Regions:
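Hydrophobic alpha-helical transmembrane segments of multi-pass membrane proteins
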Residues: 22, 44-62, 181-189
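Extracellular-loop-to-transmembrane junctions of the mid-late helices
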Residues: 125-151
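Hydrophobic transmembrane alpha-helical segments in integral membrane proteins
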Residues: 1-23
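Helix-loop junctions on the outward
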Residues: 55-78, 121-127
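Membrane-interfacial loop-to-transmembrane alpha-helix junctions, especially the N-terminal start
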Residues: 39-49, 101-109, 169-172
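Alpha-helical transmembrane segments in multipass membrane proteins, preferentially the mid-helix core
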Residues: 25-29, 90-91, 119, 141-163, ...
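C-terminal transmembrane-bundle signature of multipass membrane proteins
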Residues: 148-151, 171-243
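Internal transmembrane alpha-helix with an interfacial aromatic "cap," most often the third helix
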Residues: 27-33, 78-125
């Protein structure tokens, strides 16, 4: 009972709990729908379920860590991201594969996402004095992913794959452009380098608590929303082909 009371009084831990339940519920939904999904889109929906399942497991441990220590579970969060974000990038390859997406595109997306996350972790945890440099490197990798999705190979292949894929790719692109933009903000607020050397907040601990809440909400929206777009695509594309 004490454990539950602490969770209800701790807004950060409470959002970790909500995140765990939301991610797990989404995973169950995606996995159960696999039998109702055509073979063409089954892998994409499976990956969506894996993304939310991996996140649910990590959120369970992040909540426990936060309750026990009161600290932000930065390490566990990056472990989650380094597993789930590349999988989110894989989705772009999977949905454009029928238009001729090459394996090289898959590796570009995965490599860029790993560079973005590893450099972010180094700047936020291992080399905080050099956080500006690491943040810039992470940002370059992020904008490279944005370029591929909005103007590069992904965008061109999506147009060739048909109107349903093109529409879904655009929605997913907005998740990357807008939804993922919250994470650099957390990096800026939580590192001594701030915004190119300008510390934006005086109470970093309070900022990190606030950003944990924002991260948790953003993670749920981004990961579950990403999967729902893929799921909707699997339904609308099949319906269009049967019409």
């Amino acid at each position: 009972m004490e454990h539950l009371r602490i969770a209800s009084d701790n807004y950060v831990a409470f959002t970790f709990f909500i995140g765990t339940m939301a991610m797990m519920a989404a995973s169950v939904f995606f996995f159960l729908e696999l039998n109702n999904t055509s073979k063409q889109w089954r892998t994409s929906v499976l990956v969506s379920g894996l993304i939310t399942f991996i996140a649910a497991v990590h959120y369970y441990y992040m909540r426990s860590y936060n309750l026990e220590t009161g600290d932000s579970p930065t390490f566990f969060r990056y472990v989650d991201w380094i597993l789930t974000v590349p999988l989110m990038c894989v989705e772009f390859y999977l949905i454009t594969k029928k238009a001729g997406a090459k394996i090289g595109l898959l590796w570009k997306l995965i490599f860029a996402s790993l560079v973005m996350l590893v450099t972010g972790y180094v700047g936020e945890v291992l080399d905080r004095d050099g956080s500006v440099l690491w943040g810039v490197l992470s940002g370059i990798a992020y904008f490279y992913i944005v370029y591929l999705i909005w103007f590069g190979e992904v965008s061109k292949l999506a147009q060739q794959a048909g109107p349903q894929v093109a529409k879904a790719t655009k929605v997913l692109g907005w998740f990357v452009l807008v939804g993922w933009a919250i994470y650099p903000l957390g990096y800026i607020l939580g590192t001594p380098g701030g915004l190119f050397g300008i510390q934006l907040v005086s109470d970093t601990a309070a900022a990190l608590n606030a950003m944990d809440i924002v991260y948790n909400i953003a993670d749920a929206i981004n990961k579950i929303g990403f999967g729902l777009v893929i799921y909707a695509l699997s339904r609308t594309d099949n319906a269009a082909e049967k019409a």
